């Protein structure tokens, strides 16, 4: 499964939805969307959640568009750790063993690139050499 995200400035005027693709829409800041999700007010899937988390630092849409023009696309090959409700990505110390449900290495001494979904709010960790 692939999830694609596109970045562009919205045109002026009213938003027009395709009834085949969406039933509702609203403009919302990334931080507000994540706060709603943390309080069970908005359902998000992991690719959207991680993307929104990465957008929080931008002061406005123009700054975000400018930064993404310079950035290379990021690809995430996910491995699910069902018993821990987590997704792991390359660079995480447990990425190679995630499929066999091995215990995670000592949290304080490892490289981490994961999304912990065991409780709300979700926590995105990208530390050590996984940066």
Task: Report each predicted region and the residues it spans.
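Active-site segment of metal-dependent pyrophosphate-handling enzymes
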Residues: 1-14, 48-54, 71-77
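A generic structural signal for well-ordered coil/turn residues at beta-strand boundaries
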Residues: 2, 21-24, 76, 83
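Non-transmembrane alpha-helical segments in soluble domains
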Residues: 34, 53-56
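Core RNA-modification/binding signature centered on pseudouridine synthases
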Residues: 55, 60-131
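NUDIX/MutT-family hydrolases
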Residues: 4-10, 16-42
């Amino acid at each position: 499964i692939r999830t694609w995200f596109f970045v562009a400035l919205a045109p002026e005027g009213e938003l027009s939805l395709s009834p085949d693709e969406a039933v509702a829409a609203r403009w919302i800041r990334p931080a507000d969307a994540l706060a709603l999700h943390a309080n069970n007010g908005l359902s998000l899937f992991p690719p959207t959640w991680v993307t929104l988390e990465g957008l929080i630092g931008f002061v406005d849409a123009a700054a975000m568009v400018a930064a993404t023009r310079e950035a290379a696309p990021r690809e995430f090959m996910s491995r699910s750790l069902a018993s821990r409700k987590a997704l792991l990505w390359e660079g995480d110390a447990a990425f190679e063993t995630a499929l066999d449900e091995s215990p995670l290495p000592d949290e304080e001494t490892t490289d981490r690139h994961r999304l912990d979904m065991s409780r709300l709010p979700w926590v995105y960790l990208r530390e050590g050499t996984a940066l």
